Amino acid sequence: MDKRVFGVETEFGCLVADENLGNPEQIVEEIKDHLFYDKKIGLIDHHARDDVFEPAESGGFLLNGARLYVDAVGSHLEYATAECQSLKDLVANDRAGQRLIVQALHDLGLAEDCAIYNNSVDHFGGHTFGCHENYLVRAEGELMNGTLHLLIPFLVTRQVYAGVGRVGGHVLFEGDAPTYEQLSQNPIDYIWVSHVYGVAPDPSVKFQLSQRADHILRTIASKVRFNRAIVNPKWETMYSQNGMTRLHLLFGEANQNEYGYALKIGTTALAIRACESGLISHDFLLAQPLVALRDISRDDSFQWLLELQDGSIVSALDLQSRYLEACQAFKGESDQNDWILTEWERTLNDLKADPMQMGDRLDWVAKKLICEEYMASEQIGWEDDALQSVDLEYHNIDPAASLFYGWQEMGRSKRLLRDLDIMVAQADAPKDTRAHGRSKLVEHVLKRKGAPIYTFDWSSVQVDRQRFTQLPEPLDPYANPLDQWGQPIFGDK
């Protein structure tokens, strides 16, 4: 596919310093209710999308084309971006969601004692928070029917520029089967971490590239609730009624740096296309993908060596260069493709020269530098627990409190966006995907007097049980979605 949409789902953690304000589960409900009922940034679902995981009024679609909800598994906030074709639109839409959440904290007077984080691991409890990527692919195409495994080496090695960095590590071990009493009295994520497998700190690891590498158990898995994998194929047609589906990538992390975020999504989109186009050789395949995943993340020598299926030893940078070379076939097709290819090559060259000079572009480098500066000022070592707090505060999404945004304010982080871009994206959906049409329908229902009955989904909208609009094509902006209903709309003017 020469054109595709992509989107990112991010799960957020919440910390509450003042227990008198309530627990984190109560705080995220307050944030959600404030945004939908008071600020009216979207339409809250009055139906259950899932009786267990997304009951009625757990969230809904927003004016900017995205979706915000409280995931019942862990009771955490989750934000799914609008469908995007442009990397700039994607990063802006993602950051817009964060700004809306932060503004709610301030509106509610909670910002001093509550914080929201896009970190991907809990250092102490062993829980992880997902940052999942979605890419439009053909359900009957080459990727989903024979070449998906050729994408795995790319995903394993892209952490050299896509990783967000992590202080310390975890060791997993087999857990005991939970009792019926524990199943009934505890949330699913507690059962998952405490019983499906056990988690313990690994004191041998000072710092690593990835927050989630220690927790990945499979390369490809169709069922992922208790089976963390790199890729979830999503054998479904929810993205389109014309033979399209979504590729759901589970091994990823929430990038703070705009450049690193865009590079991760852009290179992955091109690598997917290369696999679809038959440009990737079986010579790229890894001998042990999960071993390589952890070894690369934990290699503090930055050699990042791994073994291929043919027995040869190559570096992660060399393997990334092979994917880059294959993707040069798409050079000249668009400004976006050319940016991706140019920056991909520049990043690999700079990583070969000196990774620690890339703190302006890569999250793991910036975080490591911040930790080292803190250690020098406090005269402590990597074993000090204070560094786990530094790690966490890097991912505070409030620009007024985040270590990352402090880094950015000092001019030490490369930006792709203006603050104005993020502000606009809080209310406006991307104009070249179906998110545009869906947002127009959200806007229309919000303006309507009374209390209409409605059901919104990614690809369809129903209002008053009589008006139904389909939005099957992700690449169609549906400039006039109300026309499908005829006149008058909803029976009012």
Please state what every model-predicted region is.
Residues 1-118, 127, 149-162, 201, ...:
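Terminal catalytic/cofactor-binding subdomain
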Residues 106, 112-219:
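Internal, well-ordered domain-core segments that constitute the primary functional module
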